[in-house]
Amino acid sequence: MKRLLFIYNPHAGKELLKPKLADVIDIFVKAGYEVVAYPTQAYRDAYKKIKKYDSSEYDLIVCSGGDGTLDEVVTGMMKRDRDKREPIGYIPTGTTNDFASSLHIPRGLLEAADNAVNGEVFACDAGRFNDDIFVYIAAFGLFTDVSYQTKQSMKNVLGHLAYVLEGAKRLFNIPSYKVKV
């Protein structure tokens, strides 16, 4: 029997996965997988889990969460030897899910779960900036840490607006520079 490691962030977005978790796992099982479910417990937890598992244990890795959870899984996978990288499926349950939208991954949890186990595998570009891996965006500037500094509790209540409010707090701290033209 094929084996699937399901890494998920139970607090992503507005905790959308929790009420449908059994249905998602059922889709995996019906697709012929023995499933090991791993709920993340802290920042970088998904990264650590992916880096240390034995590649002979799983045929497919599926992650569920926001762009941050996906980033941790991809980063962990890219740090593994090339011959020890399994395909990654993604079920977007974050606040904005920009990466999933750009790849036309279904927004519905059950549709995305089915897509993860029955969809077509395709290559996805990954970049490296110093020692950081990225698949969606690499940025610099004044507001780049907004998505990381926005509290999960605020995202759960306000959704995307939480990012806007966190960014607005930074407006008062933008340094000014004297320039001569």
Residue ranges and their predicted role:
Residues 9, 67, 146:
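A residue-level signal for conserved active-site and pocket-lining positions in enzyme catalytic cores
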Residues 12, 70, 95:
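Short, glycine/acidic-enriched loop or turn micro-motifs at the edges of active sites
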Residues 15, 73, 98-100:
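Generic hydrophobic alpha-helical membrane-span motif
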Residues 41-44, 65-68, 94, 141:
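Short beta->alpha linker loops
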Residues 69-82:
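Short Gly/Thr/Asp-enriched flexible loops that form oxyanion-binding sites at enzyme active sites
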